[in-house]
Amino acid sequence: MQIVGDHLAELIPQGGTILTQCFGETIIGTVIRAARRQNKDFKVFCAETRPYLQGARLTSGCFAQMGFDTTVITDNMVAYAMEREGIDLFTSAADTIARDGHIANKIGTFQIAILAKYFGIPYYVTGIPDQDKHSKDDIVIEMRDPQQVLSYRGIPNTVPEVKAIYPSFDVVPPHLISGVVTDLSLIHI
């Protein structure tokens, strides 16, 4: 996976600003190491990634502890950050990459990809294509416990009569993706 980190780090402009979504444990570590080897410095904005807050709890800490200027934003601040904070590149890992170019990643990735396209910001996905997933129709979206949306750390954030849904992933169509960074190369879509 270090090769994936190397390829992704090459896409990040020196002194630039990137936006991340969720926490791709392996790729975060490899891109940080690659950026350090390439003497690259850049700012990082991490979407908090509710309801588990992987962006805030995990991704932001990795970048900050390695000396990158890191800022956490709530998931509903992405357009603001793209418009006013100089985001140069959006990146996420992919839980699934279908052979037709659709990807599945943590819920919220699709809306960020739409905003990136609107603002002309390239979106690069990291991962390995799934040979058994031919199209978006082969991607199954797991529904998780909606209680995780209705409370935070055991404290309810709404009244008991309110319901919630929690799809774990959403699917991003290939026309919103600039490229897929794999262990072999950068595949432009």
Where are these regions (language model features)?
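N-terminal active-site beta-alpha-beta segment that forms phosphate/nucleotide-binding
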Residues: 1-72
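Alpha-helix C-terminal capping segments
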Residues: 33-38, 64-66, 83-85, 111-123
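Active-site/ligand-binding-proximal alpha/beta "capping" segment
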Residues: 79-105
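Charged helix-capping and loop-helix junction motifs
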Residues: 105-111
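Glycine-rich phosphate/pyrophosphate-binding loops
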Residues: 119-134
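Polyanion-binding loop/helix "lid" in catalytic or ligand-binding cores
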Residues: 142-183
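Conserved small/polar residues in nucleotide/adenosyl-binding loops
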Residues: 187-189
